[in-house]
Amino acid sequence: IGLELEAEHLGLSYFNYVSDEVLIIADPEQLKRVIDNIIGNSVKYMDKEHGLINIRIKDVGDFIQVEIEDNGKGIAQKDLPFIFDRFYRTDASRNSATGGSGIGLSIVKKIIEDHGGKIWATSKESTGTVMYFVIRKYQEVPNE
């Protein structure tokens, strides 16, 4: 993704606020697919000359929360409740120019939910979007 971002004149920042001792149980290839899809959407719909993508990883109780924020065109409030629905595309004219089948975020949602997590988004048009997902931390079961 790094070369792709460089070619698109995008900056990427990564902030990890989680201790190295914290573990999750997850399929690394599937989580990579989730992150690649979300960042790919940020790149695809970026409308700024100097786009930014920030990735933050936080420890939130029993979960690890990942936030992927961009400063792109954003998603209309009327579309936000549906972006994880299979085949949903926000604007037909925009999507025909950028391609895509409208199933990427539905697959992302399934992967996260299959890992016992949750995914959601906030967005402001012309300001950007933040995609959030949480994955449960690994916790040892005490011996009795």
Label for each model-derived stretch:
Residues 42-43:
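Short helix-loop "hinge" at the ATP-lid/N-box region of the Bergerat-fold HATPase_c
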Residues 52-62:
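Short beta-strand/loop element within the Bergerat-fold HATPase_c
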Residues 104, 108:
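Short alpha-helical Gxxx[C/S/T] motif in the catalytic ATP-binding
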Residues 70:
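Acidic ATP/Mg2+-coordinating residue in the GHKL
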Residues 8, 13-22:
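Conserved catalytic submotifs in the C-terminal HATPase_c
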